[in-house]
């Protein structure tokens, strides 16, 4: 009889320790740590069907699929988890799974969520570089899709306030001004962005569209190309222009506005003067373009528009060289030119912004998602350990007698507890 009782007791104990003590989720974690992905997936799948902790099980199942390179399945489960879990682990793996699935726009959102949750400067910079890379990839992807669906474009759906600024055509005579083709475009975009009532396409979006169009050199600046670019970018108007070097270092800037829906072109501005007056010419041309677009800036906006991004033509030319190199993914050369631009004019914010951008893209070229994953997880572990230490210290430093509950009320013969608080000081 005693033997039967002992066997029964041991059986119950084993059931309690191994049957109830280790959950499907815990088993999945063990196998995931050992890279036994099939077994981990089975246990996490079972855990997702349980009432408690299903969202965490979906997260770990998504991570398991991610490590097995089953990215669509990883996205599915990490999306379910991200609906309720707002933690670094969920956001990071969700972003990486979306990136691997080439869902760049959604991946950007997930990485931004992770960045908001993470406070490590090192991993923060890595994610910032990743975001720069993904935004570029998203522009490329969107441009490809637009070209593929070109026949389905409905001009009636294009918003009237959307504008693109095309590259300026350099007329023969001054090859040294080639960098101004992109630099002037960037200046005009920067000015138009300051005016309410119009939405301006970023220069890089224009560039990525031109990359996908694969234009012949002799068609880059013709009228049909500008119309087509406008349709593909979904804009109502395309601003374009010319740069002409004249005798005695004179310059002539011309600007036109192409109405994409009507296919009509309107002369907007002609500005001519000596090279030293270039920035006055550029500003006057900008106001003429706004007038041709039917936009009247307020007095406050006029004051903002009259501020010059730079007054150094050499800085602007170096900046244009940098843009050309950056567009070809030659980030080393681009960085050199942007540094030169800033050497000529340390206050040139457009050059500083592009310098930061190419450095991020250069960093992204060297990145490995596995390294980012490891770095982020180490950062999370260090932060958790630090918080646990702080919690222990806080408990030790604030330890005191707690008033007794009803169940612990004094009984006859008990010694009354001290009325003063007892502080425990922990010394190193």
Model regions: which residues?
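Short beta-strand->alpha-helix linker/helix-N-cap micro-motif
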Residues: 156-226, 238-247, 266-267, 304, ...
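Pro/Ala/Gly-rich low-complexity, hydrophilic intrinsically disordered segments
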Residues: 105, 109-164, 282-321, 347-416
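Amphipathic beta-strand/beta-sheet edge segments enriched in Tyr/Trp
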Residues: 91-92, 102, 110-112, 220-293
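Canonical tetratricopeptide repeat
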Residues: 60, 93-94, 130, 354
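Short, solvent-exposed, polar/charged sequence segments at loop or secondary-structure edges
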Residues: 199-251, 316, 321, 328, ...
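Register position in tetratricopeptide repeats
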Residues: 33-34, 67-68, 100, 133, ...
């Amino acid at each position: 009889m005693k033997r039967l009782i002992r066997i029964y007791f041991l059986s119950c104990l084993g059931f309690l320790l191994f049957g109830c003590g280790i959950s499907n989720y815990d088993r999945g974690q063990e196998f995931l740590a050992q890279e036994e992905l099939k077994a981990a997936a089975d246990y996490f799948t079972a855990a997702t069907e349980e009432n408690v902790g299903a969202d965490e099980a979906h997260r770990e199942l998504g991570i398991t699929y991610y490590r097995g390179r089953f990215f669509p399945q990883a996205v599915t489960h990490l999306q379910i988890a991200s609906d309720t879990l707002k933690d670094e682990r969920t956001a990071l793996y969700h972003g990486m799974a979306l990136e691997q699935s080439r869902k760049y726009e959604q991946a950007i959102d997930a990485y931004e969520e992770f960045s908001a949750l993470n406070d490590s400067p090192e991993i923060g910079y890595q994610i910032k570089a990743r975001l720069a890379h993904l935004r570029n990839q998203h522009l490329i992807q969107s441009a490809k899709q637009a070209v593929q669906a070109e026949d389905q474009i409905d001009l009636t759906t294009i918003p009237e306030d959307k504008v693109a600024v095309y590259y300026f055509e350099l007329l023969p005579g001054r090859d040294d001004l080639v960098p101004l083709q992109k630099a002037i475009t960037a200046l005009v975009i920067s000015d138009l962005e300051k005016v309410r009532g119009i939405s301006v396409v970023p220069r890089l979006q224009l560039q990525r569209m031109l990359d996908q169009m694969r234009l012949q050199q002799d068609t880059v600046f013709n009228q049909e190309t500008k119309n087509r670019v406008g349709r593909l970018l979904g804009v109502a108007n395309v601003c374009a222009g010319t740069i002409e070097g004249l005798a005695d270092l004179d310059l002539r800037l011309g600007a036109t506005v192409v109405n994409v829906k009507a296919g009509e072109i309107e002369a907007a501005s002609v500005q001519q003067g000596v090279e030293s007056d270039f920035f006055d010419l550029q500003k006057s041309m900008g106001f003429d373009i706004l007038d041709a677009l039917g936009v009247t800036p307020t007095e406050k906006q006029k004051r903002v528009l009259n501020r010059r991004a730079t007054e150094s033509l050499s800085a602007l030319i170096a900046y244009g060289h940098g843009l050309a190199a950056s567009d070809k993914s030659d980030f080393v050369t681009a960085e050199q030119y942007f540094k030169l631009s800033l050497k000529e004019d340390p206050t040139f914010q457009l050059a500083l912004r592009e310098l930061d951008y190419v450095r991020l893209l250069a960093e992204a070229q060297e990145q490995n998602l596995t390294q980012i994953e490891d770095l982020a997880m180490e950062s999370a572990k260090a932060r958790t350990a630090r918080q646990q230490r702080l919690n222990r210290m806080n408990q030790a430093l604030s330890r005191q007698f707690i008033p007794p509950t009803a169940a612990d009320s004094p009984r006859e013969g008990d010694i009354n507890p001290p009325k003063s608080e007892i502080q425990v000081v922990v010394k190193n």
